[in-house]
């Protein structure tokens, strides 16, 4: 969750990147926004009559690739730098082969990356960035809704579909035959399935954008408050506008959906950049433009495979202009029109009436315009964990960062090849061994009673309700006596010791270390994992009078 503002002007932009069991939404990388003492974007709420509508992915604010894949996500960035509040998560498709001793097989082709930012303009004004990449499959759907209210678009030549629903012009609302044919199933509470939402969106209009476009909601009963979504780039995706309501009957709402649809040869790549603003009266933003086309070989150069780095210019009504850059490859120096050079994960260069006022660089080494700006020696700090005090949740890392006290109150990342976790630092100090960082949360994430052993396996009959979602992939299993510790590849009928890290973990050795009847602990991290945090810099430039 990203937070900004004070008092009645507090705002929060959040993203769901975890997984849970039971009564849940299909909401991987779904986002929400709260501002002006109101919920602006969010879930559709509790299911009406136990209907599948509220939990279906189409009714969230996210994207899906088809064929559908099971995904889990990890936090990649959290940072506050001057007017910028930034977060990013990466979702990856996977196959669960833990029970056969093969661990989780993570897909290189099927993934999603979503970067969010709140950018402050004043005490009560702000805008948000949503930078979204989808890879995999041969068809992508990006789905978005706000609230009820008068709706208008700019930059779209919408063509009305002749009847039907999003499922097709010949498919009536809630058509049973279509749902059955497309893999949905019927239960006591009605139909459900991945494509359930398609025959429940109607009044379909379509457009192929030729440039920047926007959608504006005059929110109902909101004292003149507008929500505007501006999309400077859609990677040639089709835009679809529909109406939607709860199919459970007596729906309390009817409102607009905006979707984007892209098809191609697998693995398809879609990159969407969008800017969100709230305003009363006149819009906060005058215009948004991409820095050239945003395809895989855009002017900012290639980034991760199939995608180009982001470059946007946001012109505000108050005379301020923000030039924004983002990439996953923080080491490549990129040039952009206007004399810009950028190497980093995120950068913002603000000018007021043509004069530089603020420069922000996150996870990078350079953001300059004609030589003016920020340069640093390295994009991030990275060091191995050399000691863990589990009683106090304190890790020691060496070599120590230049100023470990500056980490207090900020998030660091604990990583290994299978795991990346965000932890807030509560205390920091240094000694001869390195930097000691006390972390906020209990690192114990599971416990099980030992029931037996196998080679590379500590067996347990204890149920782990969150297994299967990669929560334990790359975690540590620790004996009751705390004399033995191993990195594991997952849990399925016990903890599987990772053979790539521990070549020798025979059953007899594990039986000695983990006696039957004792309880082992599963911990988030251990010695040998790395602690990482992006370097963050924000410079305010004094204005000459």
Question: PLM features: what roles do these ranges have?
Answer:
Residues 1-174, 187, 266-271, 275-281, ...:
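Catalytic and substrate-binding regions of extracellular carbohydrate-active enzymes
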Residues 11-18, 40-45, 113-115, 143-145, ...:
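Short amphipathic beta-strand/extended segments with alternating polar/hydrophobic composition
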Residues 144-146, 225-234, 238-246, 270-281:
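Short, hydrophobic/aromatic-enriched beta-strand segments in well-ordered soluble domains
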Residues 147-228:
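Polysaccharide-binding surfaces and accessory modules of carbohydrate-active proteins
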Residues 248-250:
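Edge strands and adjacent loops of beta-rich recognition modules
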Residues 261-271, 277-545:
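Non-catalytic terminal regions with compositionally biased, polar/charged low complexity
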């Amino acid at each position: 969750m990203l937070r900004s503002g004070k008092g009645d002007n507090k705002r929060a932009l959040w993203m769901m990147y975890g997984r849970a069991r039971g009564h849940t939404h299909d909401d991987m990388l779904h986002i929400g926004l709260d501002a002006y003492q109101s919920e602006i974007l969010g879930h559709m709420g509790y299911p009406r009559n136990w209907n599948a509508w509220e939990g279906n992915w189409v009714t969230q604010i996210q994207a899906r690739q088809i064929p559908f894949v099971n995904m889990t996500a990890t936090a990649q960035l959290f940072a506050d730098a001057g007017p910028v509040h930034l977060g990013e998560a990466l979702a990856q498709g996977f196959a669960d082969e833990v029970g056969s001793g093969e661990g989780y097989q993570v897909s290189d082709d099927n993934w999603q990356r979503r970067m969010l930012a709140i950018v402050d303009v004043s005490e009560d004004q702000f805008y948000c960035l949503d930078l979204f990449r989808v890879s995999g499959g041969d068809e992508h759907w990006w789905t978005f809704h706000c609230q009820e209210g008068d709706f208008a678009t700019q930059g779209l030549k919408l063509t009305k579909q002749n009847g039907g629903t999003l499922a097709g012009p010949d498919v009536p609302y809630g058509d049973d035959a279509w749902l059955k044919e497309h893999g949905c199933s019927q239960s006591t509470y009605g139909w459900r399935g991945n494509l359930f939402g398609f025959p429940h969106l109607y009044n379909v209009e379509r457009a192929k954008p030729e440039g920047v476009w926007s959608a504006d909601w005059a929110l109902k009963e909101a004292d003149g408050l507008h929500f505007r979504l501006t999309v400077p780039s859609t990677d040639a995706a089709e835009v679809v506008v529909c109406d939607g309501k709860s199919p459970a009957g007596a729906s309390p709402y009817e409102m607009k959906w905006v979707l984007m649809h892209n098809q191609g040869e697998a693995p398809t790549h879609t990159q969407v950049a969008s800017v969100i603003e709230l305003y009363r009266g006149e819009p906060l933003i005058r215009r948004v433009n991409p820095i050239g086309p945003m395809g895989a070989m855009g002017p900012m150069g290639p980034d991760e495979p199939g995608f180009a780095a982001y470059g946007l210019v946001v012109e505000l009504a108050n005379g301020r202009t923000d030039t924004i850059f983002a990439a996953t490859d923080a080491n490549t120096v990129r040039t952009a029109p206007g004399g810009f050079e950028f190497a980093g994960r995120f950068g913002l260069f603000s000018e007021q009436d043509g004069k530089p006022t603020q420069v922000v660089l996150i996870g990078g080494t350079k953001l300059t315009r004609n030589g003016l700006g920020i340069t640093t020696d390295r994009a991030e700090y990275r060091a191995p964990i050399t000691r863990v005090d589990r009683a106090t949740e304190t890790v020691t890392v060496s070599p120590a960062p230049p100023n470990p006290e500056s980490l207090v109150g900020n998030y660091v990342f604990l990583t290994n090849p299978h795991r990346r976790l965000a932890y807030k630092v509560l205390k920091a100090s240094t000694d001869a061994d390195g930097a000691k960082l006390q972390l906020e949360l209990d690192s114990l994430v599971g416990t099980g009673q030992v029931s037996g052993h196998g080679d590379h396996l500590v067996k347990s009959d204890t149920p782990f309700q969150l297994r299967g979602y990669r929560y334990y992939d790359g975690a540590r299993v620790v004996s009751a006596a705390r004399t033995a510790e191993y990195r594991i590849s997952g849990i399925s009928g016990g903890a599987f010791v990772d053979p790539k890290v521990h070549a020798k973990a025979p059953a007899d050795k594990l039986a000695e270390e983990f006696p039957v009847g004792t309880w082992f602990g599963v911990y988030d991290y251990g010695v040998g994992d790395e602690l990482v945090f992006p370097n963050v810099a924000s410079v305010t430039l004094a204005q000459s009078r």
